[in-house]
């Protein structure tokens, strides 16, 4: 079994590991000839992240047979954070079943792999009625504006207009969107849709990935999970699913 993957810089891998760490403590990656993937759900089954990292995104990539390898995310993250922005990161697996991590030219780590306890998690199959495509920086700012007054984000669309809002004990906020606004690429809706989602899950993932993503796509339907797609040039795609808030 031969497996090795080398990045040209550290930012993309840092973004991936940071995003995964917002949901799980242990992660099982799947490596094939096509690339590396990860899919995991938080313990409460509220959020799910699905990552596909194609072989073309790596400076060097080799995998002659499909393998799974599990790591403790906090330990892996500590190693990755030792890399400077321009440092390459190379990972491989030794015959002793250790993860070998080379950071830059002279830092070589060994990390013990863990037994995979992950089960195959199917992706939600949902016909979405509404879509908003906007810049990651604009979305991050909107989340910050809403979090001032609320722990939840409500998204509403109607035709080619939409709004983000939040309400809490201290007050409320509504941020209107128009398709001609700066940072907005598309607002479309087959029918009026509204959904409310937890910022506790949403904020960390957007902050983790947002710096490496240009535009993000939010898709939702009334009372259905939110689906966010991050397109990152050197990663491929990251999909994040978040269950709606259920009013008691």
Swiss-Prot record:
Q: Which PANTHER family match?
A: PROLIFERATING CELL NUCLEAR ANTIGEN
- Which family is this sequence assigned to? Belongs to the PCNA family.
Q: Mind telling me what this protein is named?
A: DNA polymerase sliding clamp
Question: What are the record keywords, sorted?
Answer: DNA replication, DNA-binding
What is this protein's function per UniProt?
Sliding clamp subunit that acts as a moving platform for DNA processing. Responsible for tethering the catalytic subunit of DNA polymerase and other proteins to DNA during high-speed replication.
What is the top-level taxon of the source organism? Archaea
* GO terms of biological process kind: leading strand elongation; regulation of DNA replication
Q: How does it assemble?
A: Homotrimer. The subunits circularize to form a toroid; DNA passes through its center. Replication factor C (RFC) is required to load the toroid on the DNA.
Q: Name one GO molecular function term.
A: DNA binding
Organism (species):
Nitrosopumilus maritimus (strain SCM1)
**Could you tell me which Pfam families the record lists for this protein?**
PCNA_C, PCNA_N
């Amino acid at each position: 079994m031969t497996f090795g993957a080398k990045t040209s810089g550290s930012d993309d891998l840092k973004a991936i590991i940071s995003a995964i760490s917002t949901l799980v403590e242990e992660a099982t990656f799947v490596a094939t000839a096509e690339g590396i993937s990860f899919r995991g759900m938080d313990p409460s089954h509220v959020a799910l992240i699905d990552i596909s990292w194609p072989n073309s995104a790596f400076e060097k990539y080799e995998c002659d047979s499909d393998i799974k390898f599990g790591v403790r995310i906090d330990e892996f993250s500590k190693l990755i954070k030792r890399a400077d922005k321009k440092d390459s990161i190379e990972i491989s697996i030794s015959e002793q079943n250790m993860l070998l991590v080379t950071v830059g030219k002279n830092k070589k780590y060994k990390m013990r792999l863990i037994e995979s306890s992950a089960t195959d998690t199917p992706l939600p199959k949902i016909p979405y009625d509404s879509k908003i495509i906007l810049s990651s920086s604009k979305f991050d700012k909107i989340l910050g504006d809403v979090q001032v007054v609320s722990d939840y984000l409500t998204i509403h669309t109607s035709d080619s207009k939409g709004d983000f809002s939040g309400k809490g004990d201290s007050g409320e906020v509504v941020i209107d969107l128009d398709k001609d606004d700066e940072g907005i690429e598309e607002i479309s809706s087959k029918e009026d849709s509204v959904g409310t989602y937890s910022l506790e899950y949403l904020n960390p993932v957007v902050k983790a990935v947002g710096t490496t993503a240009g535009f993000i796509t939010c898709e939702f339907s009334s009372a259905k999970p939110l689906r966010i797609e991050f397109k990152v040039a050197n990663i491929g795609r990251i999909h994040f699913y978040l269950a709606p808030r259920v009013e008691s």
